[in-house]
Amino acid sequence: MSNPKNLHEALKYYFGFDKFKGNQEAIIESLMEGHDTFVLMPTGGGKSLCYQLPALLMEGTAIIISPLIALMKNQVDAIRNISESDRVAHFLNSSLTKAAIDQVKQDILDGYTRMLYVAPESLTKEENVEFLRSVPISFYAVDEAHCISEWGHDFRPEYRRIRPIINEISQKPVIALTATATPKVQHDIQKNLGMQDARLFKSSFNRPNLYYEVRQKGPNIDREIIKIIKDHPGQSGIIYCLSRKKVEDLAEFLQVNDLRALPYHAGMDSATRSANQDAFLMEQTDVIVATIAFGMGIDKPDVRFVIHYDIPKSLEGYYQETGRAGRDGGEGRCITFYSAKDLQKMEKFMQGKPISEQEIGKQLLQDTANYAESSVCRRKTLLFYFGEEYTQDNCGNCDNCRSPKKQVEAKDTLCATLETIEALKEKFKAEYVKDVMKGKETSDIKAYGHDDLEVFGCEASTDERFLNAVIRQ
């Protein structure tokens, strides 16, 4: 086939697809017409095609800013696989030798390279800025744009320097893309990238094929996980743990129980990490047990379950990680284990960080706890968090809708909670408020004399989990 004449022909010619998904065509047209373009699209919606196709069709080199070396490598390999020459796409980062960098620059100068993937750190290097000023650029793509926002779940300070650097290189259209952005994060991204007038394309964040469930974390969690895996014989799944040690221990436990599982975390040597990732992609193992270092840019469409061993640090992170299930449209089970103890542990980890970071971290954690303890439809809660309305009363595909929790009258406990907070002059955390209400004679409560308050022990007989839920709400 000769060079494609229109977008549909180009889509078929380069990617083999017969039609665009969702907003893809309108997004590409917006960018090719020279408009700044902001894309909010859930995981699996086809974000990368929104900048890859125009990059192949437009004159010059597109600068694609991406946070992870592994992510860049995967995307460059994928583009080279559909192109006649490897020179069409390159990445520029700290893993390259001087000779390799010189070759990349030569290919760009010779007009062969349509896509250059760079980490923000590489983009800000003086010699790279100088070089990029001398080449024709088609547009800039900022992938994983939520990294710009302090309110995002994966804030990276170097992302804040992108706009000033773009201004130094050359003014061209910018496309910013993310799979997770609350209205607050969206505003922050647009402000920081100077994209207030950008054309906004927002796809629905609803993933109807995903089943959401939150379980109380108990002493038999490892056995429960084995049962979940055995319910999906020969199928792929991801288990997320917060600590590297837990990743190693759980992977070993699953192996001992004759399950095909491998660990993945940033502390492993890169060769083992890559080998384990490839084994998962090539279906030589069924389960990958990982920290959140795993998954960004991993395109495995048939993941059937995602388990969170620990409650995630934010709902954005939860949405992105669960979003790795069922990308082929088939079923995806998302099961999260939750305990108030985990929450306290995570709050402790935050101590020692800058105050503003602690405050944001605690707020994000609070939102996650509210989600876990809520009796409302999980889908409704999640979509509301991302600024989207869900009008159905029952989604039929979450634990709260399939087995509605018994409604309990909480008016008296709520009044007692407000009275306790008032008696403590609004100066103490939820855990302390609960201890006062339960009548616990801790050293702090005695030191402050709060065991003499009228409200001390006012909810001594109330179930602790119920009290937690009321205080959080």
Mark where each language-model region is.
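Short coil/turn segments at secondary-structure boundaries
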Residues: G22-N23, R379-F386, A430-V436, G449
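Flexible coil/turn residues that form the inter-helical turn or adjacent wing/linker of helix-turn-helix
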Residues: S170, S375, E426
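Helicase motor core with emphasis on the C-terminal RecA-like subdomain
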Residues: K5-Y14, D18, G22, A26-F38, ...
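Accessory DNA-binding and partner-docking regions appended to nucleic-acid-acting proteins
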Residues: M1-L7, N93, G361, T391-Q473
